[in-house]
UniProtKB/Swiss-Prot annotation:
Matching InterPro entries: Dimethylallyltransferase, IPT, P-loop_NTPase
One Gene Ontology CC term in the entry: cytosol
Gene from which the chain derives: IPT4
Binding-site residues, ATP: G12, A13, T14, G15, S16, G17, K18, S19
Entry function: Involved in cytokinin biosynthesis. Catalyzes the transfer of an isopentenyl group from dimethylallyl diphosphate (DMAPP) to ATP and ADP, but not to AMP. Has no DMAPP:tRNA isopentenyltransferase activity.
UniProt entry tagged with the keyword Cytoplasm: yes
Keyword presence, ATP-binding: yes
Tissue: Expressed in immature seeds with highest expression in the chalazal endosperm.
Cofactors: Mg(2+)
UniProt family annotation: Belongs to the IPP transferase family.
Protein name according to UniProt: Adenylate isopentenyltransferase 4
Organism for this UniProt entry: Arabidopsis thaliana (Mouse-ear cress)
Catalyzed reactions per annotation: dimethylallyl diphosphate + ADP = N(6)-(dimethylallyl)adenosine 5'-diphosphate + diphosphate; dimethylallyl diphosphate + ATP = N(6)-(dimethylallyl)adenosine 5'-triphosphate + diphosphate
Effect of loss of the gene: No visible phenotype, due the redundancy with other IPTs.
Length: 318
């Protein structure tokens, strides 16, 4: 990689494997990862926001992941543009490859767009709201999963998250944090608002066997709402990625459906993380992505990005 001017951007719907792929690629290419999921910036709600565990990170440095105080307000896209740019600069100074991974596409646009107006929402219906000129020489990868397969997987994943303590985590968050007048930052995370009415109505008690039918229905209603809102989020994310593509962003799509079908089968049969699912992932997803990234890194320097990089370095030293 020459001149430290290139980076990889992993995109896709929630639950599509962006975090896993980013770590896989980081281990191949001596990279560090910058989180671009706006709900994962904050400390707390690690299960609810599905933050990568230390084990999942496999020794790869991560930036802007679970670092910020959730009571300090909301990180805006404009603030992320500055914070992530600083992380990119630090990573490239270490001669490492920056990998951006996450599903908050408006924040991704804010960071990468050469021209950015905080007052202009990029995904509005107004023509030309998305900036097609980029600050960095990006290799974009979109992990795509068939919608029906992804929805089934997300439903199973949420059931597992609930069994792993998501409800208890949300209840403790509500008890220990002062809620803002309007949802801000992590308070907007799917799960927090859906359980808000329930937690105002019932005192904390996780012994579900003692719950009356009305309480059980209130709980199940919240879980259904979480699933429905998660499904809608994935649709919105895909719509935004397609808008970026239509605006000229060269986003390469890699189909991960076969891997997710195997993950669903394994989950239903109680196998946990199946060896076969990993083999399919490596063949159908990781190997093509390694080729895409290697091809991008081997390309001649795009001197527009090189001179932009030098200008940034010059200004930072003066």
């Amino acid at each position: 990689m020459k001149c430290n001017d290139k980076m990889v951007v992993i995109m896709g719907a929630t639950g599509s494997g962006k975090s896993s792929l980013s770590v896989d690629l980081a281990l191949h290419f001596k990279a560090e990862i910058i989180n671009s999921d706006k709900m994962q910036f904050y400390d707390g709600l690690k299960i609810t926001t599905n933050q990568s565990t230390i084990e999942d990170r496999r020794g790869v440095p991560h930036h802007l992941l679970g670092e910020l105080n959730p009571e300090a307000g909301e990180v805006t896209a404009a603030e992320f543009r500055v914070m992530a740019a600083e992380a990119i600069s630090e990573i490239t100074q270490r001669k490492k490859l920056p990998i951006l991974a996450g599903g908050s596409n408006s924040y991704i646009h804010a960071l990468l767009a050469k021209s950015y107006d905080p007052e202009n929402y990029p995904f509005s219906d107004h023509k030309g709201s998305i900036c097609s000129e980029l600050k960095y020489d990006c290799c974009f990868i979109w992990i795509d999963v068939d919608q029906s397969v992804l929805f089934e997987y997300l439903s199973l994943r949420l059931d597992l998250m609930m069994k792993s303590g998501m409800f208890e985590e949300i209840a403790e968050f509500h008890r220990s944090k002062k809620a803002p007048k309007e949802p801000l930052g992590i308070w907007k995370a799917i799960g927090v608002q859906e359980f808000d009415d329930y937690l105002k109505m019932y005192k904390w008690d996780n012994d579900m066997d003692k719950w009356d039918p009305m309480r059980k229905e209130a709980y199940e209603k919240a879980v259904r709402a979480i699933k429905e809102n998660t499904f809608q989020l994935t649709k919105d994310q895909i719509t935004k990625i397609n808008k970026l593509r239509n605006a000229g962003w060269d986003i390469k799509k890699v189909d991960a459906t076969a891997s997710f079908r195997e993950a669903i089968r394994a989950a239903k049969e109680g196998e946990g993380v199946a060896e076969m699912q990993r083999k399919i992932w490596n063949k159908e997803v990781l190997e093509p992505c390694v080729k895409i990234v290697r091809s991008h890194l081997d390309q001649p320097i795009n001197y527009y990005y090189y001179y932009f990089y030098l200008l940034k370095r010059f200004l930072s030293l003066n």
